[in-house]
């Protein structure tokens, strides 16, 4: 370079030239423009960023701490003594809220130590964690870093931003949610204490095994309330939350143990526990997981997702009452399974335990248990087509190909499985599909037979105190409940409620009213048959007809009072399954007919409704709507449903109820129900058997409880003589134990009941010297007692052959006292005598027939 004067002057001259000046100005202008553009873009970018940020914040939900709760909470069902008996819970709804005073101090400290050790120092956001999370976010290409969120943010994530699981790999959605999460975390921390936030967190956090919150988790893993947990156990639960699947202490105890160790170390480091407490917890490591494993076995056995028949019935009744209260069906079910309701049921745990034990006792059933097969088969053809076969298809195939009497009832389970193998092979061959387990799916269930169900009600309150809907293993929740859902023909139990109750109550009949047990036909000409095989018993009063369950008299009685009256009384007794003109196939069916007296119905009734009807008689004629619960509240104690005073109505007079009770006491002491009698307890009831018999019942009551027991085959196979008595056996054995420690009062006699001596052959006042052998004392509702004298007994010429008043030409007459209407009949020896006379003198005189 030339740095002399001459060189410098030359350089200066060049710089001052016009062309050089223009070039410099142009370059400078370009630089300025570029700088302005950069600044402008930066400003726009910042403005846009601020706008986006403001947009995100503006879309952040406005919340209060009361809004920060888990969405779902299990509904708990309690028995009448306040013990939990069941939970209704949907997925992600098994949460039980508790107060801070019910959570051990070490539980909160364990969560703080493992999840957010600076929880009590930061303002809802831990900036150190954010920096660490940001670094991990960039390093992993957008995957959110573990431990990035504070306890406050996790609470919001699990209660407010519950749809975060749908974000997938959408980074924009994740960033938006994180910004809103952090903003709300700051807001919540401004207005609420750390302990309030921590309590909400511990009641909401997902802790695996479909549990939300520490109370639910404590009960699931340890079988005790969280207030009773040790430091060791608190650390187990706190170690789950980061990844409830990976750190599940039942499925992955080794993974949970590693994180638990970290939790305990941090608790010690932070001064939350002493060295001695730490050492004790560490020493418990093996034992704590052993306890969890052992309890899980017990839990699985006790809570095999089947629930109880009683709990199932409670669910249905609460659901229906919620619908009546204005909820639609979907809303009612959601509220029941995730609304955190508290249901106070009427179940008496002691009585229910007795019922369960007796139904599980093999000695209460015939020795040779039979099995009913329920089978479904799906065969997958080579082209992927699914071919479905039901148990009905199976039964049809066997009847057509092997056994016309095939009915899905087997003497052993082995026989049932053999039949399944035979049928499956035949169907596979029919479709040309290889007999390979990959080519078919099947469902096989077997239930012991005959089946049975029983309901027990406290008649004075309408409380259903116990219920069982079947014997054997319950297959699942809300499966067939024979106590509430199975409609079976009630047989002779209906004689009382359909025929005699209305007759005594409003048709002028009394227990002394007599009918002739003699041949009688229904209106269509079909003979009415008595349950005993041959003969008739002649004149019988209603008391003896109830005691001995006489079919003909029950039908004659309802014919006189009209089936319509009987039907109307049944509706008032609470039966909801009756029909009055319904199309079944091509026929119009109605239960308003003479066979109503014998339980001849279109569909049948349930043990639940039959129990309630008999309970009305036991309760002095007052029907109390049967109830399975008294109150339903939300988790805060607000009453949702109040069932403490269910509707009642007077179905029959108090005097009518007593008369029926008196007659049904005879059933137990000297009639068809003698097998149910026990001790000195007053019992009234009625047996019921249907044609076949396919159904066997006993419905009865004491001064305390009413119960109905049904026995039969699920597919209506006839009961044998040993099986026919199961209902009475179960009724007696259950009710005897239920009443063991109770006094033995008699049924009270209400005012308006009087006793009058009557003639059993006429139901009227006896005539001295004529009715002496037929006089007995009967109860009457005052005003219904007889005022006329006997018109059956007769003094004069008697037929020696049949004991009736002799007709004029009876060859066997003598002078004496007879009972019976009409005169002697032309049968047997009489006809032989008449024929001999016809041969001798050509004369013939017919005897009158008795009525």
PLM feature spans:
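Non-catalytic structural connector segments
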Residues: 275-406
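Conserved catalytic neighborhood of penicillin-recognizing serine enzymes
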Residues: 140-162, 295-303, 508-566, 593, ...
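N-terminal type II signal-anchor transmembrane helix
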Residues: 2-80, 85, 138
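Short, well-structured active-site flanking segments
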Residues: 120-130, 212-214, 274-277, 494, ...
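Mid-domain, small-residue-enriched loop/turn segments at the edges of structured enzyme/sensor domains
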Residues: 526-531, 562-610
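Peptidoglycan glycan-strand catalytic modules in the bacterial/periplasmic cell-wall system
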Residues: 2-8, 72, 79-279, 288, ...
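A penicillin-recognizing enzyme superfamily signal
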Residues: 345-366, 371-375, 379-387, 391-446, ...
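Active-site SXXK
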Residues: 109-112, 267, 355, 461-462, ...
């Amino acid at each position: 370079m030339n740095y002399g004067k001459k060189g410098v002057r030359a350089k200066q001259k060049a710089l001052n030239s016009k062309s050089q000046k223009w070039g410099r100005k142009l370059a400078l202008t370009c630089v300025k423009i570029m700088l302005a553009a950069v600044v402008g873009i930066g400003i726009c970018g910042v403005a846009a960023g601020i706008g986006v940020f403001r947009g995100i914040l503006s879309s952040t939900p406005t919340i209060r701490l009361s809004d920060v709760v888990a969405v779902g909470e299990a509904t708990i069902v309690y028995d009448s003594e306040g013990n939990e008996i069941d939970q209704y819970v949907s997925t992600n709804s098994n949460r039980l809220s508790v107060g801070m005073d019910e959570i051990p101090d070490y539980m909160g400290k364990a969560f703080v130590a493992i999840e957010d050790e600076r929880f009590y120092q930061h303002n809802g956001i831990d900036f150190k964690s954010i920096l660490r999370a940001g670094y991990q976010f960039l390093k992993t290409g957008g995957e959110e870093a573990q431990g990035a969120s504070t306890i406050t943010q996790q609470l919001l994530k699990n209660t407010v931003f519950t749809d975060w699981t749908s974000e997938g790999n959408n980074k924009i959605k994740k960033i938006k949610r994180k910004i809103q999460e952090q903003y709300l975390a700051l807001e919540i921390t401004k207005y609420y204490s750390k302990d309030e936030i921590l309590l909400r967190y511990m009641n909401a956090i997902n802790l695996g095994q479909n549990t939300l919150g520490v109370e639910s988790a404590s009960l699931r893993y340890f079988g005790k309330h969280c207030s009773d947990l040790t430091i060791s156990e608190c650390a187990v639960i706190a170690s789950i939350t980061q990844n409830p699947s990976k750190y599940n202490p039942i499925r992955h105890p080794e993974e949970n143990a590693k994180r638990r160790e970290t939790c305990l170390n941090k608790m010690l480091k932070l001064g939350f526990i002493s060295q001695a407490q730490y050492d004790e917890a560490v020493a418990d490591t093996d034992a704590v997981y052993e306890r969890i494993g052992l309890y899980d076995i017990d839990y699985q056995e006790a809570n095999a997702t089947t629930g109880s028949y009683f709990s199932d019935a409670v669910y249905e009744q609460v659901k229906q009452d919620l619908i009546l209260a204005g909820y639609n069906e979907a809303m009612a079910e959601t509220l029941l399974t995730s609304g955190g309701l508290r249901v106070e049921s009427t179940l008496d745990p002691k009585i229910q335990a007795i019922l369960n034990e007796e139904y599980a006792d093999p000695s209460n059933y015939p020795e040779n248990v039979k099995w009913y097969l329920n089978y479904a088969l799906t065969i997958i053809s080579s082209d992927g087509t699914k071919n479905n076969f039901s148990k009905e298809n199976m039964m049809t195939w066997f009847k057509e190909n092997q056994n016309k009497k095939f009915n899905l009832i087997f003497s052993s389970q082995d026989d049932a499985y053999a039949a399944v193998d035979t049928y499956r092979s035949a169907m596979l061959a029919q479709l040309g599909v290889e007999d390979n387990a990959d080519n078919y799916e099947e469902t096989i269930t077997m239930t012991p037979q005959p089946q049975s169900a029983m309901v027990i009600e406290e008649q004075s309150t309408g409380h259903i105190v116990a219920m069982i809907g079947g014997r054997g293993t319950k297959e699942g929740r809300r499966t067939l409940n024979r106590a509430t859902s199975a409609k079976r023909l009630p047989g002779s139990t209906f004689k009382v409620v359909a025929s005699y109750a209305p007759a005594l109550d409003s048709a002028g009949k009394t227990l002394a009213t007599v009918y002739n047990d003699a041949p009688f036909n229904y209106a269509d000409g079909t003979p009415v048959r008595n349950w005993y095989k041959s003969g008739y018993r002649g004149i019988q009063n209603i008391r003896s007809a109830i005691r001995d369950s006489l079919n003909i008299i029950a039908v004659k009685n309802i014919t006189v009072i009209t089936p319509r009256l009987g039907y109307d009384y049944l509706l008032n007794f609470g039966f909801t399954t009756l029909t009055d003109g319904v199309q079944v196939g091509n026929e119009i069916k109605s239960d308003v007919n003479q066979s109503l007296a014998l339980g001849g119905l279109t569909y049948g009734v349930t043990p639940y409704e039959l129990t309630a009807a008999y309970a009305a008689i036991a309760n002095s004629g007052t029907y109390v709507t049967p109830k399975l619960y008294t109150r339903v509240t939300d988790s805060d104690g607000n009453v949702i449903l109040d069932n403490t005073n269910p509707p009642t109505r007077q179905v029959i007079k108090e005097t009518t109820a007593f008369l029926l009770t008196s007659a049904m006491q005879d059933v137990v002491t000297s009639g068809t129900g003698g097998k149910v009698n026990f001790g000195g307890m007053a019992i009234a009831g009625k047996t019921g058997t249907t044609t076949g018999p396919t159904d066997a019942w006993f419905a009865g009551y004491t001064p305390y409880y009413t119960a109905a027991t049904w026995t039969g085959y699920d597919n209506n196979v006839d009961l044998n003589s040993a099986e026919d008595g199961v209902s009475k056996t179960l009724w007696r054995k259950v009710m005897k134990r239920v009443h063991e420690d109770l006094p033995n009062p008699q049924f009270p006699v209400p005012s308006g009941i009087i006793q009058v001596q009557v003639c059993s052959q006429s139901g009227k006042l006896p005539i001295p010297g004529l009715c002496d052998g037929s006089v007995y004392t009967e109860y009457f509702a005052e005003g219904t007692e007889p005022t006329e004298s006997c018109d059956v007994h007769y003094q004069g010429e008697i037929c020696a052959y049949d004991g009736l008043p002799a007709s004029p030409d009876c060859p066997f007459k003598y002078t004496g006292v007879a009972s019976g209407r009409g005169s002697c009949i032309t049968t047997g020896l009489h006809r032989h005598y008449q024929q001999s006379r016809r041969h001798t003198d050509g004369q013939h005189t017919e005897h009158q027939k008795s009525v």
